[in-house]
C-alpha cells in the first residue's frame, strides 16, 4: 500500500508559526499549511514587550519593521486570562496607583498565589472592594476571610466574613503620626510597642497599650491656648496614633482567631505583583493611557 506524503514523513519543528516536515525517503524538508502568521508574531512581540521589557523602538530594530507595525501587532494581541476559581478562598485586596487617577484594585488568593480579580480604578473606594468581593462570590467562590489596608468603613462592609487589618499598614500609620524617630518619650514608647505587633498576641498587645494609656493619660490631655482663647490638644498626632490603634484593635489579630483558615496578617502577597507591574510600566514611560 502506498503512503501519503504525511505518512512517509515526520514532524521537523516549526518555522515562523508553520509546522515543518521531513520526508523519510528523500530527506526533503517542507512546510505544512500556513498557520495563523499574525497571531504567532503578535504573541512573540507581546512577550518581548511585556516580559522582556523591550521598548517599541527596540522591537522595531529587532524585527526590522516600522513603529506602526509593532503597535499594530501589540494592539491585535488579545490577553484572555483563564481563572480557575476555587470553592473557597482568603482574599487579600489592595489598590496600587501608576499615576494620579489611574490604579488597579487587585483581589488575590495568597494561599494559592493566584489573582482572582482586578479592576481598573480612578480612586480607591468602598464600592470597588464591595463589587470585587461580590463578583468573586458570584463565580461560586466562598470568601472565608479578607485582608485589607483598613480603609475607613471597610471593616463593616462585609458582615459574616472575618476581616484582618494589614499589620504592616497599621505600622505605617503609626510611623506617619510619630515619624520614624519620635522625640517625645511617650512617642518612643508607643512606637516600641507597635514594633511588636507582628510577633505578639491580642491579649499581650492590648495590655501594653492600656498600660501606656494609663501612664500618659494626663500628658495626652494637655491643652494649648491660642491668643483668642481657643484651645486645642497639644499632642494631636500622638492622640491620633493611639486612636488609630484603639479603633483597629478588633481587626489586628483576626488571623489568630481563625488558625484553620490560614489568614495572612499583612497584604504583602500583593507587593510582588505591584512591584512587577510598576517595573513594566516604568520600562515604557510615555505610552498612551490606553496602552498603559
Description of each model-found segment:
Residues 1-34:
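Short, conserved DNA-binding cores of transcription-related domains
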Residues 15, 29, 65, 69-152, ...:
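RNase H-like nuclease fold core
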Residues 58-63:
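Short alpha-helical "recognition helix" segments of helix-turn-helix
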Residues 20, 27-28, 32-35, 42, ...:
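Acidic/histidine-rich catalytic cores and adjacent linkers
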Residues 22, 67-72, 161-166, 284:
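Core catalytic machinery and nucleic-acid-binding channels of phosphodiester-processing enzymes
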Residues 145-191:
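Conserved beta-strand -> loop -> alpha-helix junction used to position metal-binding or nucleic-acid-contacting
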Residues 53-54:
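Residue-level signal for the short linker/turn that defines the boundary of a DNA-recognition helix
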Amino acid at each position: 500500500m502506498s503512503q501519503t506524503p504525511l505518512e512517509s514523513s515526520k514532524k521537523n519543528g516549526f518555522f515562523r508559526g508553520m509546522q515543518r516536515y521531513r520526508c523519510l525517503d528523500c530527506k526533503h524538508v517542507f512546510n505544512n499549511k500556513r498557520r495563523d502568521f499574525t497571531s504567532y508574531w503578535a504573541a512573540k512581540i507581546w512577550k518581548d514587550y511585556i516580559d522582556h521589557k523591550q521598548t517599541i523602538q527596540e522591537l522595531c530594530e529587532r524585527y526590522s519593521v516600522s513603529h506602526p507595525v509593532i503597535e499594530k501587532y501589540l494592539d491585535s494581541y488579545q490577553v484572555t486570562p483563564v481563572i480557575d476559581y476555587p470553592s473557597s478562598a482568603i482574599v487579600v485586596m489592595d489598590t496600587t496607583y501608576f499615576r494620579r487617577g489611574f490604579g488597579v484594585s487587585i483581589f488575590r488568593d495568597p494561599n494559592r498565589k493566584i489573582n482572582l480579580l482586578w479592576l481598573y480604578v480612578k480612586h480607591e473606594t468602598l464600592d470597588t472592594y464591595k463589587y470585587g468581593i461580590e463578583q468573586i462570590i458570584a463565580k461560586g467562590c466562598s470568601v472565608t476571610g479578607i485582608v485589607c489596608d483598613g480603609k475607613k468603613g471597610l471593616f463593616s462592609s462585609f458582615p459574616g466574613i472575618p476581616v484582618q487589618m494589614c499589620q504592616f499598614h497599621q505600622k505605617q500609620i503609626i510611623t506617619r503620626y510619630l515619624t520614624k524617630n519620635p522625640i517625645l518619650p511617650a512617642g518612643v514608647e508607643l512606637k516600641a510597642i507597635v514594633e511588636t505587633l507582628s510577633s505578639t498576641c491580642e491579649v499581650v498587645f492590648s495590655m501594653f497599650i492600656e498600660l501606656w494609656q494609663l501612664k500618659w493619660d494626663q500628658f495626652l490631655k494637655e491643652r494649648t491656648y491660642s491668643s483668642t482663647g481657643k484651645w486645642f490638644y497639644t499632642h494631636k498626632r500622638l492622640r491620633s496614633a493611639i486612636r488609630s490603634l484603639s479603633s483597629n484593635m478588633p481587626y489586628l489579630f483576626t488571623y489568630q482567631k481563625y488558625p484553620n483558615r490560614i489568614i495572612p496578617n499583612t497584604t504583602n502577597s500583593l507587593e510582588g505583583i505591584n512591584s512587577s507591574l510598576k517595573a513594566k510600566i516604568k520600562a515604557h514611560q510615555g505610552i498612551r493611557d490606553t496602552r498603559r
